[in-house]
């Protein structure tokens, strides 16, 4: 039964234009025996846990478009209608390293199942789509890096400008404040000196008047000065006030 299944696979694959079996190989012996059951399908089960999230739904493609038993890994690997559907889904949903990871896992599982090179047999159009998906991620990464670099330079320039503006404003404020404080100090000092001089002058005048008055009183009391002289002294004292 298994031999008939493998023979039908080889015949269908050849008719569909899939890579031919290398000459000299026996199509009945190149496929290892596989378990005749699968939780998803023979292609997905053994690599599902290692797939990137973007590809996990892709490997759940229906196997009804193929003559393969759903559990037959080798048969599914050589069916372009199944492999192509998986590949197109990956190209739409995955980018960059994710694409490379899926291709590597698919190649590995198909090689382990005994399929000949190129192992995972997808149409050329699907291969091109996968290549573009991988390249698109690389270009996006480069653009993102450039944008981040430009943003960082702009931010740095703005910070430098802000610091220079703040420094200039601080310097200007200091210059404006210094003359005002100096002028105020000078005015205060001048006023203090004027007040001190005035107080000194008043003190001296008071002292002189007191001295004169003392002399006049003493002379009057002694009775040694004529009345006219005493009157003149009193007039002189009065003039001082």
Swiss-Prot record:
One of its GO terms (biological process) is endocytic hemoglobin import into cell. Induction: Induced by iron starvation, hypoxia, amphotericin B, and during hyphal growth. Repressed by ketoconazole and caspofungin. Regulated by BCR1, HOG1, SFU1, TUP1, and UPC2. Residues 1-20 form the signal peptide. Residues 140-210 are annotated as: Disordered. GO terms for molecular function: heme binding; metal ion binding. The keyword ATP-binding does not apply. One of its GO terms (cellular component) is yeast-form cell wall. InterPro entries: CFEM_domain (IPR051735), Extracellular_membr_CFEM_dom (IPR008427). Residues 140-154, 163-182, 200-210 have a biased composition (Low complexity). The GPI-anchor is attached to the protein in the endoplasmic reticulum and serves to target the protein to the cell surface. There, the glucosamine-inositol phospholipid moiety is cleaved off and the GPI-modified mannoprotein is covalently attached via its lipidless GPI glycan remnant to the 1,6-beta-glucan of the outer cell wall layer. Mannosylated. It is a lipid-anchor; GPI-anchor. Residues 26-137 form the CFEM domain. Its main location: secreted. Disulfide bonds join 54-94, 58-89, 68-75, 77-110. Residues 222-241 form a propeptide. Residues 183-199 have a biased composition (Basic and acidic residues). The keyword Electron transport does not apply. It is found in: Secreted, Cell wall; Cell membrane. Keywords: Cell membrane, Cell wall, Disulfide bond, Glycoprotein, GPI-anchor, Heme, Iron, Lipoprotein, Membrane, Metal-binding, Secreted, Signal. The CFEM domain is involved in heme-binding and contains 8 cysteines and is found in proteins from several pathogenic fungi, including both human and plant pathogens. The CFEM domain adopts a novel helical-basket fold that consists of six alpha-helices, and is uniquely stabilized by four disulfide bonds formed by its 8 signature cysteines. GPI-linked hyphal surface heme-binding protein involved in heme-iron utilization. Heme transfer occurs between PGA7, RBT5 and CSA2 supporting a model in which the 3 CFEM proteins cooperate in a heme-acquisition system and form a cross-cell wall heme-transfer cascade. The ability to acquire iron from host tissues is a major virulence factor of pathogenic microorganisms. Required for biofilm formation. Interacts with PGA7. Belongs to the RBT5 family. This is GPI-anchored hemophore RBT5. It comes from Candida albicans (strain SC5314 / ATCC MYA-2876).
């Amino acid at each position: 039964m298994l031999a008939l299944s493998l023979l039908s696979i080889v015949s269908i694959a050849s008719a569909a234009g899939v890579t031919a079996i290398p000459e000299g190989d026996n199509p009945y012996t190149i496929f290892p025996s596989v378990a005749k059951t699968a939780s998803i399908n023979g292609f997905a089960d053994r690599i599902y846990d290692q797939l990137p999230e973007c590809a996990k739904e892709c490997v759940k493609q229906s196997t009804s478009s193929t003559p393969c038993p759903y559990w037959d890994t080798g048969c599914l690997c050589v069916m372009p209608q199944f492999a192509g559907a998986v590949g197109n889904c990956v190209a739409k949903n995955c980018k960059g390293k994710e694409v490379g990871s899926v291709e590597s896992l698919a190649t590995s599982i198909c090689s382990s199942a005994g399929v000949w090179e190129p192992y995972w047999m997808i149409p050329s159009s699907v291969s091109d789509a996968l290549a573009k998906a991988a390249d698109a991620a690389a270009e996006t990464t480069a653009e993102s890096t450039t944008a981040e670099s430009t943003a960082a330079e702009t931010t740095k320039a703005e910070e430098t400008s802000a610091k220079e503006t703040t420094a200039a404003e601080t310097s200007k404020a200091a210059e404006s404040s210094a003359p005002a404080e100096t002028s105020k100090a000078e005015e205060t000092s001048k006023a203090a000196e004027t007040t001190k001089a005035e107080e000194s002058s008043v003190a001296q005048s008071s002292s002189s008047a007191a001295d004169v008055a003392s002399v006049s009183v003493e002379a009057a009391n002694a009775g040694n000065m004529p009345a006219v002289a005493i009157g003149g002294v009193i007039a002189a004292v009065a003039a001082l006030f």
